[in-house]
């Protein structure tokens, strides 16, 4: 298991402990990828997981670019259309740094 996969598993477990329900992982399209798809009450939650072992080159949150946010939004839109879902959604980020988990709800 790669470090990225380990971080996604850790994030998934953490979010499940917070009351979210797992739906899918690593949803890939040619134009973007969604790390985790979860449900929280009436919302579908598209989660980007960022991992950094140290923040000497900027923390996990700083690793999320505007271009990447655009690709995630496009992938989420496609996911909703493909699954014929007309539901409220949000975009969360789980940042894992120095073995600490930071959950940013409705991050973008």
UniProtKB/Swiss-Prot annotation:
One of its GO terms (molecular function) is nucleic acid binding. SUPFAM superfamilies: Restriction endonuclease-like. CDD domains: PoNe_Nuclease. It holds the Pfam family UPF0102. The lineage of its organism: Bacteria, Pseudomonadati, Pseudomonadota, Gammaproteobacteria, Alteromonadales. It comes from the Bacteria. This is UPF0102 protein Shewana3_3881. InterPro entries: Restrct_endonuc-II-like (IPR011335), tRNA_endonuc-like_dom_sf (IPR011856), UPF0102_YraN-like (IPR003509). Belongs to the UPF0102 family.
């Amino acid at each position: 298991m790669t470090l990225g996969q380990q971080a996604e598993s850790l994030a998934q477990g953490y979010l499940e402990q917070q009351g979210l329900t797992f739906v899918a992982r690593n949803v890939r399209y040619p134009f973007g990828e969604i790390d985790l798809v979860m449900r929280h009450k009436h919302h579908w939650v598209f989660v980007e997981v960022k991992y950094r072992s140290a923040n000497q080159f900027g923390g996990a949150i700083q690793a999320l670019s505007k271009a990447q946010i655009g690709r995630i939004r496009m992938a989420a839109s496609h996911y909703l259309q493909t699954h014929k879902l007309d539901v409220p959604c949000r975009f969360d980020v789980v940042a894992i740094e120095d073995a600490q988990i930071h959950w940013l709800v409705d991050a973008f």
